[in-house]
């Protein structure tokens, strides 16, 4: 089949990311592109955060079905094994990004109808709540700080599935036993391959927070005696 060229939306996202990579032009701590799963775009987003050194990219991943085909229709249920393999084959290695899976069901505010959204949509709420009730260096996960504004996860998970996702540095989102209607993030890994404190989101965000505060102090002292 002949190539149709790059997706126009991917090209636009990459152009925007090139602007965001400039610290002098923009300021932010978290980067999210809900529903953007293209490897070319997500790789560029990771590079942008690494170049800035003061932001974490929270990413959605490519979903594969049970037949190992890339899912284009959100109604198709993901095949966990093939999704993990697809992600692992990218061999991403960075402490400036974190991946979540799967999509979740939320209520549309206008009419309370259920809608399926990428995991990053729910995780932005988790991160915001974590920072409001605690601090960026607390883990945005678990029963205390990891609850999403959602009522169902697209994939039902047992312990084996949870472990497989976590071993692949994919943070699982699921409904724990006995908590029907409640969805939680149960992982806070970055994509750093080596065992290190920086393989955890809260540690990377702590260092980002320190770096930003030191920068602000330095700016205030600039040109002072």
Q: Which stretches of residues belong to each language-model region?
A:
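Structured, hydrophobic secondary-structure cores that serve as assembly/anchoring elements
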Residues: 11-225
């Amino acid at each position: 089949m002949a190539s149709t060229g790059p997706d126009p939306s991917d090209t636009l996202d990459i152009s925007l990311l090139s602007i965001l990579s400039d610290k002098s032009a923009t300021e932010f701590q978290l980067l999210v592109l809900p529903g953007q799963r293209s490897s070319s775009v997500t790789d560029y987003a990771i590079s942008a955060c690494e170049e800035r050194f003061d932001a974490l990219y929270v990413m959605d991943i490519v979903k594969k079905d049970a037949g190992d085909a890339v899912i284009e229709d959100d109604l198709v249920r993901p095949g966990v094994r093939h999704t993990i393999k697809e992600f692992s084959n990218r061999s991403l290695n960075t402490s400036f990004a974190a991946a979540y899976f799967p999509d979740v069901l939320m209520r549309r505010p206008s009419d309370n109808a259920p809608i399926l959204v990428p995991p990053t949509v729910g995780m932005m709420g988790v991160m915001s709540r974590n920072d409001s009730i605690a601090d960026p260096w607390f883990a945005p996960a678990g029963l205390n700080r990891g609850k999403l504004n959602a009522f169902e996860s697209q994939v039902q998970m047992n312990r084996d599935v949870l472990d497989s996702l976590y071993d692949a540095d994919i943070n699982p989102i699921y409904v724990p036993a006995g908590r029907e209607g409640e969805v939680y993030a149960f992982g806070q890994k970055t994509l750093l391959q080596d065992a290190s404190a920086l393989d955890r989101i809260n540690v990377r965000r702590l260092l980002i927070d320190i770096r930003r505060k030191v920068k602000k102090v330095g700016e205030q002292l600039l040109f002072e005696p």
